[in-house]
Amino acid sequence: MRRRATILADLQQHGDKISFKPGDNNKSKLTVSVNAPRQDRFSAPVSNADLDVLNHVADVSVAWGRPSAAQQPVLFAAAYEPGLHVTVVKKQASEPRKWGEEKPSEAAPELVHVAKFLEEQLGLPVDPKTFIESRSDYTYYDPLVGPEAFGHFVDKHSACSDESEEFVNDLDTFNYAQSASFHIDHDKKELVTEVTIPDLEHYFNQKKQHISRACKNDRLEVGIFDLNNLATSYAFRGVAELKGLLHDSTKEKPQETFLVIEPRHNIGAGSVSVDFERPVGLHPKSELKLRHIAIPTDHNDENDGVKHCRLFAKYSAPSSIFFDKYQLADLERTTSEHPNGQGRLLALWGEADLEEPRYHTEGWGSEALVEIFPITDAPEGTPFNLNFTLPLHLRYEEPKEGETYEPNEAPWPLVFWVCAETDEQLANFKQSPFDVTHNSYMRLFPEGVSYHHIGPREANGRGFPLLSTSWGTPVADIDRFAAVRDYTSIMMVAGFLMVTIAILRKVFRGKAMSEELKEKKEQ
């Protein structure tokens, strides 16, 4: 197995203090005397038998994001949705089940193979019936899984050939991971996992980093780079110049190195906060408050930035929520306040039966991609504020004993600009070896685009918030079921009697009037 650790440090300030020191197991363990954000990449060659899942689906990838935010350096700016997300690409596109169609009694056979693959490689017990389906993909979401799944992968593929060889494990740092991913490298026949770890000194007061290769035959590379200021957070496509030291366990001494790359993921200007309008009923509204955001500028063509960048929000909603695509069509309706409309629904997949109670749904939930139309006359690069509201619906929850509310939680949507590239930019594009290519939302866009992610707003100096919205859904109290049933029955009977009496009164009153008229005529 090969391990590559990339550390972003301030070489101008701490360069003379940085060194690579072998640990207890010689070159198999290093202590790096600097603490800064880092990305660990593990690549493990596998056999055809390990990749049997590709006989049933075209691809499988996994992405995980911590439900709390942290400052991300530009080089590791790719945003991850909170929780664990699995994307399975079908071998052939097919239409998903539509509203009103009968549910299949068994999970799709290919998903059974996917569940087995995830269990073997990541230790994830996934129910194949909980996947939701779009025309080209299956997706799965779990808010409770942590970074330990990626440690399971490293443990599995780090079995030393010599049983007497000591297994060196520093995977406890995975507990601090901010994000992680897992994918299949089809060309190299490798399984790859990447883990991004924040500045441990800043968040956890650790001053050194310990990095190891598990066995003597494994390869370990550690790079410490200084990020040049040319890679700005406002750049349409910023150029990052990286200089630093590279340690390779197959070589005797660290080497100076220099890279020029163009990150596909960038940190956009401004911030976002997300919440439901309060109080929350059965028809809540999700509010996005975007502050000091700016349309990314194209530094290669100053008159070209606005028309190439568009703003999106990618939602993942648990089964307690459903999206009404007919109601969301109203986002495009023009008003005096929104002359171009508020936005438009571009993609929606997941649980199809809108009025089905939550306790009858099998899939984990639904996903939606929405384009947001900015209302601004500000030129590109100029900050402005924007509010966006998305109407939602809550499913009926199962009655509970002694409870009138069911606690629920939904992850924040990802909010980002997507900017198209010109042919010249694509031709001169310098691919970053640190780019994330297997995040679920990236399959919704062409390859030749860059992303500018809008991060969460800090909560009044108390640090970053949890990237989730909590609420209570009203439920029936099962303790009061008998009383409510009896009361309802009495009221129904009483109502029936009242209506019957009213009808009979009219009938008898009509007969009496007829008799009266008849008597008058006879007189």
Swiss-Prot record:
Top-level taxon of origin:
Eukaryota
- List the Pfam families hit by this protein, alphabetically: PIG-X (PF08320)
Q: Where are the transmembrane segments?
A: 487-504
| A GO BP entry | GPI anchor biosynthetic process
Q: Which stretches face the Lumenal side?
A: 1-486
Does the keyword Oxidoreductase feature in the UniProt annotation? no
Its membrane topology = Single-pass type III membrane protein
Q: In which pathway does it act?
A: Glycolipid biosynthesis; glycosylphosphatidylinositol-anchor biosynthesis
Q: Which InterPro entries match?
A: Pbn1 (IPR042322), PIG-X/PBN1 (IPR013233)
Q: Which residues does the record list as glycosylated?
A: N26, N387
For the keyword Glycoprotein, the answer is: yes
Q: Where in the cell is it found?
A: Endoplasmic reticulum membrane
Any idea which UniProt keywords this protein has?
Endoplasmic reticulum, Glycoprotein, GPI-anchor biosynthesis, Membrane, Transmembrane, Transmembrane helix
One cellular component term (GO) for this entry is:
endoplasmic reticulum membrane
On the Cytoplasmic side, which residues? Answer: 505-523
Task: Outline what the protein does.
Answer: Required for proper folding and/or the stability of a subset of proteins in the endoplasmic reticulum. Component of glycosylphosphatidylinositol-mannosyltransferase 1 which transfers the first of the 4 mannoses in the GPI-anchor precursors during GPI-anchor biosynthesis. Probably acts by stabilizing the mannosyltransferase GPI14.
Homology family: Belongs to the PIGX family.
This chain's protein is named Protein PBN1
